[in-house]
């Protein structure tokens, strides 16, 4: 699909008459990141849109990511909604995708029916630095990890990884903080974070939940940053329950 002059790999599943849910992958992810959730969302009757963000997976390559403000990603997401003539949707975003979801829900509150964030970032905190550096070492020295990313991103894999790494390590972003926009979010929101998250403290998740007016916090015991992939057996049922309850009550 041609969106804002670049080609995006966009998949639309289910009936167009079903309630819309958009899945936003994490900073090194792709549509494949949601393979454990997609079938069950479809079985529940949702219309699901999942896509490789610009620069990722089977979408066009990208010279640099618009991090951490994600302005180009937000513009793409709005254009996808408009292309499918979707007036309202639920958003489910993981990590960077969760940040994008928060920013869009704050900017366009009437268009978002329900919001689920998993390990989203709303400011930079000291714990993020060591976690990012650990992943850089893993990418450089762990062939299995690198090959897994290559299967998702192909020849773009270096651009994806170092674009993400560079985006979160720019010194000019040290004071980045989106907490002031969170009160603008109007929809029911589930804030999810693994209790053993390698990139964020429990306070980070609490700050998201405290900032969004209609939010509830779920800390998942014994799970790290990759909640949908590490613990689908507990995450997916809770996701379906939350979306079903909040969209139905809209």
Describe each model-derived feature in a short phrase:
Residues 99-107, 112-144:
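Flexible "cap/lid" loop of the alpha/beta hydrolase fold
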Residues 196-200, 225:
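Acidic catalytic loop of the alpha/beta-hydrolase fold
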Residues 89, 93-95:
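Conserved alpha/beta-hydrolase "nucleophile elbow" surrounding the catalytic nucleophile
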Residues 216, 222-250:
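Catalytic active-site module of serine/aspartate enzymes centered on a nucleophile-bearing elbow/loop
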Residues 164-181:
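Active-site nucleophile elbow and catalytic-triad environment of alpha/beta-hydrolase enzymes
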Residues 50-89, 237:
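Active-site loop/oxyanion-hole signature of alpha/beta-hydrolase fold enzymes
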């Amino acid at each position: 699909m041609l969106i804002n002059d670049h080609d995006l790999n966009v998949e639309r599943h289910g009936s167009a008459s079903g309630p819309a849910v958009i899945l936003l992958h994490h900073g090194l992810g792709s549509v494949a990141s949601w393979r454990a959730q997609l079938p069950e969302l479809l079985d529940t009757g949702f219309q699901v849109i999942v896509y490789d963000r610009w620069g990722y997976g089977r979408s066009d390559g990208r010279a640099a990511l618009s991090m951490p403000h994600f302005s180009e990603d937000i513009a793409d997401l709005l254009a996808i909604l408009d292309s499918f003539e979707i007036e309202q949707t639920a958003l489910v975003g993981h990590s960077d995708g969760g940040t994008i979801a928060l920013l869009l829900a704050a900017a366009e509150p009437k268009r978002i029916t329900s919001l689920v964030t998993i390990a989203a970032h709303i400011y930079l905190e000291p714990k993020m630095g060591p976690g990012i550096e650990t992943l850089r070492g893993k990418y450089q020295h762990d062939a299995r990890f690198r090959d897994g990313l290559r299967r998702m991103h192909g020849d773009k894999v270096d651009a994806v990884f170092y674009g993400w790494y560079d985006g979160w390590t720019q010194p000019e972003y040290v004071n980045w903080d989106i907490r002031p926009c969170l009160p603008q979010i109007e929809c029911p929101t589930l804030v999810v974070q693994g209790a053993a998250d390698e990139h964020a403290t429990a306070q980070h998740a609490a700050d998201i939940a405290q900032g969004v007016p209609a939010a509830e916090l779920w800390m998942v015991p014994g799970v790290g940053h990759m909640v949908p992939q590490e613990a689908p057996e507990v995450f997916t049922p809770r996701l379906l329950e939350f979306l079903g309850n909040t969209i139905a009550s809209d």
